[in-house]
């Protein structure tokens, strides 16, 4: 399976106060059927790391690669989902999902067939012709996810995709993300501020320190795989170990913040 890697990447920005280091010597990887979650305080470089993986910007030092080949820009092998869904309101749902395929020159019938497939995957079958202003915030995020899946990327890069949703919709979306992951086997890199969400979704959890962003801890977790194997969400969240890990991570993040 393909592997997306960051090799000792650092990002330094120029500012009026001098050089500002956003990331420092960060190494990590995402492979197929993995969910790597980055967790840390605001300003710790999580979104900068995603930007490097997506090819939106180069690192100041270090390198990013897919299967050893350097990442020099965005690519169809990496689908990106943002907190702001960035949908085009003048297009209906299916045309939003198929837009990237259209830009790649895929014919109408083929791109619409693929769009319908991924809309079924995110449980939006029947909403193909709806305008964007006719659907809810959670549904808009599902359209954004479907759009990222339409080109069948090897990796999904998700920058706080659930951050703007209400609590109940967020829980539904967490379950949907795990369903999509189980169905597709994609490699996922996800950013969140929610410790509970990180514990639930991550197969590997990266804790980043406040600026400069460094990976200060890595945790292997099995709750997502337990769900994928058929265990209920209720059973997982009622597991005392889930609560223990959640509380321990909150304490760790608080210590990291206090040390700044």
Swiss-Prot record:
Domain of life: Bacteria
Database matches in Pfam families: ABC_tran
EC number(s) on file: 7.6.2.7
Occurrences of domain ABC transporter (ranges): 6-235
Keyword terms of this UniProt record: ATP-binding, Cell inner membrane, Cell membrane, Membrane, Nucleotide-binding, Translocase, Transport
Compartments it resides in: Cell inner membrane
This protein's record includes keyword Membrane: yes
Membrane topology: Peripheral membrane protein
Binding locations of ATP: 40-47
Reaction catalysed by this enzyme: taurine(out) + ATP + H2O = taurine(in) + ADP + phosphate + H(+)
GO molecular function annotations of the record: ABC-type taurine transporter transporter activity; ATP binding; ATP hydrolysis activity
PANTHER family per record: TAURINE IMPORT ATP-BINDING PROTEIN TAUB, TAURINE IMPORT ATP-BINDING PROTEIN-RELATED
Entry similarity comment: Belongs to the ABC transporter superfamily. Taurine importer (TC 3.A.1.17.1) family.
Role: Part of the ABC transporter complex TauABC involved in taurine import. Responsible for energy coupling to the transport system.
Protein name: Taurine import ATP-binding protein TauB
Organism name: Burkholderia thailandensis (strain ATCC 700388 / DSM 13276 / CCUG 48851 / CIP 106301 / E264)
Lineage of producing organism: Bacteria, Pseudomonadati, Pseudomonadota, Betaproteobacteria, Burkholderiales
The encoding gene: tauB
């Amino acid at each position: 399976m393909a592997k997306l890697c960051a090799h000792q990447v650092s990002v330094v920005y120029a500012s009026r106060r001098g050089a500002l280091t956003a990331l420092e010597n960060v190494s990590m990887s995402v492979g197929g059927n993995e969910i790597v979650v980055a967790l840390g305080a605001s300003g710790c470089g999580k979104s900068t790391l995603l930007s490097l993986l997506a090819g939106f910007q180069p690192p100041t030092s270090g390198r990013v690669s897919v299967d050893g080949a350097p990442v020099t820009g965005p690519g169809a092998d990496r689908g990106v989902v943002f907190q702001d869904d960035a949908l085009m309101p003048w297009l209906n749902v299916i045309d939003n999902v198929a837009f990237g395929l259209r830009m790649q020159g895929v014919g109408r019938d083929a791109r619409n067939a693929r769009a319908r497939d991924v809309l079924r995957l995110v449980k939006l079958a029947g909403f193909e012709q709806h305008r964007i202003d006719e659907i809810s915030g959670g549904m808009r995020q599902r359209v954004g996810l479907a759009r990222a899946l339409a080109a069948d990327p090897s990796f999904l890069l998700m920058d706080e995709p659930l951050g703007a949703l209400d609590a109940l919709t967020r829980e539904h979306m967490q379950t949907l993300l795990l369903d999509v992951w189980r169905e597709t086997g994609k490699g996922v890199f996800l950013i969140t501020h929610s410790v509970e969400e990180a514990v639930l979704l991550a197969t590997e959890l990266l804790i980043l320190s406040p600026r400069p962003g460094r990976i200060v801890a890595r945790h292997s977790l099995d709750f997502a795989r337990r769900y994928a194997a058929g265990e209920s969400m209720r059973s997982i969240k009622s597991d005392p170990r889930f609560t223990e890990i959640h509380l321990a991570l909150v304490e760790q993040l608080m210590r990291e913040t206090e040390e700044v």
